[in-house]
Amino acid sequence: MRERLGGFGVRAARLLARQATTPYRLIKSLSIKPPTRLWIAPPDIRTADSTVADEVRAGYFTYEGKTLHVAAGEAPFARFAPSAGWRRALTGFSWLRHLDETDRPMARRLVDAFLSSPGMRDDPALEPAVVARRLLSFLAQSPLLLDEADPDYYERFMQALAHSARLLWLALGPGKSRGAERLLCAVALVEFAVCADTGGAIAPEAMRLLSRELQRQILADGGHIGRNPQTPLDLLLDLLALRQVFAARGLKTPETMKRVIARTLPMLRMMQHGDGSLALFNGAGATARDRLANVLAHEETRGPAPLQAPATGYQRLDAFPALALVDAGGAPPADFAGDAHAGCLSFEYSRGTERVVVNCGAPGPHNPEAREAARTTAAHSTLTIGETSSARFLEPPRGAGSRLVEGPDKVTVERRAHDNETTLILTHDGYAAAFGLVHARDLTLSHDGRTFSGRDRLLTATDGGATKPADFALRFHLHPQVKATPTAAGVELALGNDERLLFSATGADVQIEESVYYAHPAGARPARQIVLAGKAAAGVDIQWSFTPLPPRLSPSSATVPPEEKL
C-alpha cells in the first residue's frame, strides 16, 4: 500500500521527526507499515450510552464539562476547542462506542474529517495518551468504520493506524511519555501488533515493552505505583479487552499480563465501598460504577476482599455493615506523583451502601480549578497542623500540574486483631521537619460492625525540627447525604437510609463546619465536616467514636398502652 499523507499523516510525520530520540527508533518506527486488513476487532467492555449517541447525531459534542454545537453535517475538528481537555476527549474517539450501525455513514464522515483536518499548533490530539486512546477506539470500532467502505477511505484509515502506532513507538522511548500514560501507550501498541496483519514486525518488542511497564508500575498487591485507586480500573478496561484479542487469535497471553490481571481485580474490590464506588484517595474522583462492575465480572475466582495492600499503602477494616478504608502510605515516586494527594492517615467510613466519612475527592472536569485545593491535607479526613499539608507540592515547568514531593519519610502500620475488634496503629512524620511533631492514629472497628472508634495523638519527633506554635485541626468530612446535628452528647448523624449515628469525642471541642464534596458525577456538592481543633503540641490526645443510635419511632409505630385502647 503506497502511503499518501493527508492532514493527520503530515502532522504525524512531522512529529515523528521531532520525537525520534535515536536513528534506531526512527528507522524502527518506519518499519510499521499500514495494514491491508485487520485480523480482529477488539471488544470494548465500556458501557455504551444511547443518549450520547443522540447528542452526536444532533451535533452536540460534550466532554470535560464543555459543549460545542455544530450544524448538521459539519465536523467539529476544525472549530476552536473550548479546552485542551475537550480536544483530547474529542480526538480520542472513545465516543464512537455509543454509535450503532445506523450511524455508520456519520461515523465514517467524522473520522475522515479528522484525518483530513490540518490540526492546530501544539495539538493535544498528538499527545501520546490521546494517540493511544484513538488507536484503541479505531481498532475496537473498525467494523462500524470499515464495513462497506470505499477503497480510498479504507486506505486513509489504515494509514492512520500505522501513523498512530509509529507515534506510540517513539513515545515509549526513553524520557518521552511518563507515568500511567506509558502503560496506555504500550497496551495500544500491542493491540495494533496483534490485530493488524503488518503488526508482526513489532509484536515481540511491543510485548516486551508492555511487560516491562506492567512490572514497573503494578505492585505486588495489585495497586498502581501512583497510588490512585482508579488507575487499575482504567488499565483493566483495556487490558481485559487485549486478553480477549489474544484468545480470539489463538495466541498465548503473556504471563506478566495474566499475573497483573489476577492481582488488580482483588485490589479493586479491596478499595470498593458498599455503594460500588472506589475510595477517594490520591486522585480518585467519581467512580464510573458501570465500568467497575463490568471489570469485576471478569474475576474468575472471588474470595473475600483483601484487608491489606502494603506495597501500595492501603488498609481495610471490614465488619459488616461497617467498612473503613485507610491511606497508610507515603508519596509515590516523582514520575507518578502528578495525581497524588497529601492525605496520609486519612480514612473513609461507610455502613452498607451509605457513605459516612469521606475525603473530598478529586474534582471532575466541571471544576478543574479546585484540583490543587482537593489535594491538600485539609481536604482529607485526618489531622492538619498550622493549616499546612503533610506533604509539599512542586509546580513543574510549563505548568503541567504540581507533583507531590517530600511527603512523610516514615509511615508505620501495625495491625492488631483482638477477640472483639481489630485495630490499626499508624504514624507519619510529615509534620516533623516543620513542627517537630508526629501524628499517631489508632483506628478500631468492632467485629460486630457497630462501633468505629479512633485515637489521634501528637508526639515529639525524635529527629525533627523544633516545635513551633501552631494550631491543629482534626477533620471528618461527611458525605453530602449525611445530615449533622449538634447535641449535648456530640453530633448526631442521619444517613440516607434513616440510620442514625452518634459521633462523640474527648480531648477537643467539637464543631460543625462547611465542606465540599468534589467527587459527585455532576460536579461539586456542598457538605459538612466535623472539626476538632486546638493548640498543636506534644501530648495532644483525642479519642472519638461513631456508634449507632436506636431508630426513631414514627407516630404510627408507637405502642399504645392497653388501658388507653379501652
Predicted regions and their residues:
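Aromatic-lined, polymer-binding surfaces characteristic
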Residues: 74, 81-261
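CBM-like, beta-strand-rich accessory domains located in the C-terminal region of large
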Residues: 132, 368-566
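Short capping micro-motif at the N-terminus of alpha-helices
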Residues: 70, 326-327, 358-359, 495, ...
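Residues that flank catalytic or metal-binding motifs in active/ligand-binding sites
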Residues: 91, 185, 313, 345, ...
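Short solvent-exposed loop/turn micro-motifs enriched in small/polar/acidic residues
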Residues: 53-54, 308-310, 340-342, 376, ...
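Short, acidic/polar N-cap/turn motifs at the starts of alpha helices
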Residues: 58, 312-316, 346, 380, ...
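Extreme N-terminal leader/anchor segments
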Residues: 1-71
